[in-house]
Amino acid sequence: MRRFAAGCLALALLVLPFVLTGARAAEDESEKEIERYRQMIEDPMANPGFLNVDRGEVLWSEPRGTRNVSLETCDLGEGPGKLEGAYAHLPRYFADTGKVMDLEQRLLWCMETIQGRDTKPLVAKPFSGPGRTSDMEDLVAFIANKSDGVKIKVALATPQEKEMYAIGEALFFRRSSINDFSCSTCHGAAGKRIRLQALPQLDVPGKDAQLTMATWPTYRVSQSALRTMQHRMWDCYRQMRMPAPDYASEAVTALTLYLTKQAEGGELKVPSIKR
């Protein structure tokens, strides 16, 4: 019996490298297929994410709310109604609110103050689903696309921005949940993988952070939907078995500012496409 068990163990150890190699090869082939798909839809008219861009453009100029006005006077940091380059410089401090805000937070504020709109329904269901679009995702896609080709650059010029960055850094390394995970568990070192998928290192400035942050929002092929960084944060927390962060919360803004700072110099290519 011992000889049989030993033989089985030896056989398993012999076969295991080939199994892992085969699985990794399959994963690599999947990545190649996605890359081929990306190349096929370089034409904006072929990327499904641009349907969100088109819907967002309509929403931006559509009169809504109790005041029946559009969002075209909303100041996203570059001046009222100016969209080019705005997304590349967010999150940032806004003097009229006394807060550091990301795009979603700022949009919700503009809806409430300019349009007189109740944003609770938008916050309650911020992400699209089967048979349901999302105004927030569409607006983010449209506005982000106006910064396509612009290099990421966020300021840490005010005390509020510096404090928010420090909070984001602390959140990135904070271990929690039943798994004792943090963002750094997956993204705090080079060469990590999960289910044989490469994980970008996001705790230091560099190419990984640039390629990651510069390609959101993105059309997710596996979900047949456009997803924003807000959704990516929500999904990461879900996978870590942590309570979901509130949509457009200061915690998400802080973490986004920290990650975006690591990605400075990266050229936005949005909406992109991912698996």
Curated annotation (Swiss-Prot):
Heme c binds at residues 183, 187, 236. Pfam families: SoxA-TsdA_cyt-c. It comes from the Bacteria. Its cofactor is heme c; Cu(2+). The gene is soxA. Cysteine persulfide at Cys-236. Activated by free Cu(II) ions and pH values above 8. Belongs to the SoxA family. Its main location: periplasm. Disulfide bonds join 74-110. InterPro entries: Cyt_c-like_dom (IPR009056), Cyt_c-like_dom_sf (IPR036909), SoxA (IPR025710). GO terms for molecular function: copper ion binding; electron transfer activity; heme binding; iron ion binding; oxidoreductase activity; oxidoreductase activity, acting on a sulfur group of donors, cytochrome as acceptor; protein heterodimerization activity; sulfurtransferase activity. This is L-cysteine S-thiosulfotransferase subunit SoxA. Its EC number is 2.8.5.2. Gene3D superfamilies: Cytochrome c-like domain. The active site is at 236 (cysteine persulfide intermediate). Binds 1 heme c group covalently per subunit. GO terms for cellular component: cytochrome complex; periplasmic space. Changing residue 236 to M: 564 mV change in redox potential of the heme. Catalytically active, but 46% reduction in turnover number in an enzyme assay that uses reduced glutathione as the sulfur substrate. Residues 163-263 form the Cytochrome c domain. It is found in: Periplasm. Keywords: Copper, Disulfide bond, Electron transport, Heme, Iron, Metal-binding, Periplasm, Signal, Transferase, Transport. It comes from Ancylobacter novellus (strain ATCC 8093 / DSM 506 / JCM 20403 / CCM 1077 / IAM 12100 / NBRC 12443 / NCIMB 10456). Residues 1-25 form the signal peptide.
